[in-house]
Design a protein with these regions (language model features):
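Short, solvent-exposed loop/turn elements at domain surfaces
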Residues: 50, 70-71, 153-156
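Short, low-complexity N-terminal intrinsically disordered segments enriched in polar/charged residues
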Residues: 20-56
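Sec-dependent N-terminal signal peptides
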Residues: 6-15
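Short solvent-exposed beta->alpha transition segments
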Residues: 53-105
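Positively charged n-region of N-terminal signal peptides that target proteins for export
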Residues: 1-5
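Exposed beta-sheet edge and beta->alpha loop/turn motif
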Residues: 101-157
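Generic secondary-structure transition motif, activating predominantly at the C-termini of alpha-helices
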Residues: 15, 43-47, 82-86
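Prokaryotic Sec-type signal peptides and long signal-anchor helices
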Residues: 14, 19, 82, 132-134
Length: 157
């Protein structure tokens, strides 16, 4: 009888441990495969750009699709683009919100509303493509394929 109780306890512990491991794996896999998470990382890098420009640039550039990098690169040119009109309006943004407007198996489009550091309010369209990860060619991840220039609203906040 005592052996049976220990066996049941052992099986419960093994089952619980396997569930936790599965949930952790699933969560981390989802983190890598959700375009919303990538977009949040990128926008948070824009939000804190001045506090660590090199890290922010590495994050933003790291999630750029190879086609995007070909057009906007090399990285030094990409940085110059970020620091000049109209894209510098996104740097050090105060707040943002986004809505997914298009969703396909390999492409997601977001409408992003941004409150800039100067209190102007604008939106951009951000387009991701699910493609081969630059850091790990055996995996696919969401990469920025395009970002529109800011479209300003009539009045700020």
């Amino acid at each position: 009888m005592l052996v049976k109780k220990y066996l049941i306890l052992f099986l419960v512990l093994v089952f619980c441990n396997n569930n936790i491991s599965s949930q952790e794996t699933t969560t981390s896999d989802l983190d890598l495969q959700q375009s919303e998470n990538v977009l949040t990382q990128i926008l948070d890098s824009y939000k804190t750009y001045s506090s660590d420009p090199e890290e922010a640039l590495d994050t933003i550039w790291g999630f750029a699709h190879p086609s995007n990098k070909e057009i906007t690169g090399p990285k030094e040119n990409f940085e110059k683009m970020l620091l000049s009109e109209p894209y510098n309006a996104i740097l050090d943004l105060k707040e943002y919100s986004f809505t997914k407007t298009v969703e396909t198996e390999d492409s997601n489009h977001y409408e992003i509303k941004i409150l800039a550091k100067n209190n102007s309010y604008f939106e951009v369209i951000w387009v991701f493509q699910f493609d081969e990860c630059p850091d790990n060619p055996k995996e696919n991840c969401w990469l920025t394929i395009a970002v529109t220039a800011p479209s300003y609203y009539e009045s700020g906040v």
